Amino acid sequence: MIGRIQGTLVSVHPPRLLVDCQGISYEVDVPMSTLYQLPQAGQKITLLTHFQVREDAQQLFGFATETEREAFRQLIKISGVGSRTALAVLSGMSVNELAQAIALQEAGRLTQVPGIGKRTAERLCLELKGKLAPDLGVAGGKPQAIETSSEVLQALLALGYSEKEALLALKQIPADTSISDGIRMGLKYLSKA
């Protein structure tokens, strides 16, 4: 449908923006993380979008990054999580924090988001496990660091540690560590735990 919108930012009324594209103005709902990255009104912007058609409304949601949009799409697939709740989650925590909370099964972190209760948080942890990029939040975002952390994670899993234990150990390893040093540091951390 509508995958991207490019135009002039007319106004901002959180969480809604008004974007003018060739004389047509679109209302776009965005998470706070995207809102913080916006330029001043009157400037050009580009947003990745998700277009949702329901029997009573048509809505356009905008995101600064592909990871935000993909996280939103994964969230709205979950029973009981609508677009407003998904926006609240992405406004209350970054995609990296969400991925970490899901990977570590920390429902308590999710309940800190307004509108997310204990049951919804547990459902999010259960249904999103393995669906968000596993490297998010583990490394600083550098391709080599992500590859290294992925290798270290796989090695710790192959050695019989649970995903939760391996991810906790991975958090203790600096991003610029080599694979062999990372495995060694991870094993050292896990032997103390």
UniProtKB/Swiss-Prot annotation:
CDD domains: UBA_RuvA_C. Coiled coil: none annotated. Residues 65-139 are annotated as: Domain II. SUPFAM superfamilies: DNA helicase RuvA subunit, C-terminal domain (SSF46929), Nucleic acid-binding proteins (SSF50249), RuvA domain 2-like (SSF47781). InterPro entries: DNA_helicase_Holl-junc_RuvA_I (IPR013849), Hlx-hairpin-Hlx_DNA-bd_motif (IPR003583), NA-bd_OB-fold (IPR012340), RuvA (IPR000085), RuvA_2-like (IPR010994), RuvA_C (IPR011114), RuvA_C_sf (IPR036267). Residues 144-193 are annotated as: Domain III. Keywords: Cytoplasm, DNA damage, DNA recombination, DNA repair, DNA-binding. The keyword DNA damage applies. This is Holliday junction branch migration complex subunit RuvA. It comes from Polynucleobacter necessarius subsp. necessarius (strain STIR1).
